[in-house]
Amino acid sequence: DQVKIVL
């Protein structure tokens, strides 16, 4: 799985 969080 790939999780990408951009804030």
From Swiss-Prot:
Annotated Gene Ontology cellular component terms: extracellular region
Tissue specificity: Vitellogenic follicle, fully grown oocyte, egg and internal egg-capsule (at protein level). Not detected in previtellogenic follicles, external egg-capsule, central nervous system and hemolymph.
Cellular localisation: Secreted
GO BP field: neuropeptide signaling pathway; regulation of muscle contraction; sexual reproduction
Record keywords: Neuropeptide, Secreted
Chief location: secreted
Function text: Has myotropic activity targeting the genital tract.
Protein name as it appears in the record: Ovarian jelly-peptide 1
Organism: Sepia officinalis
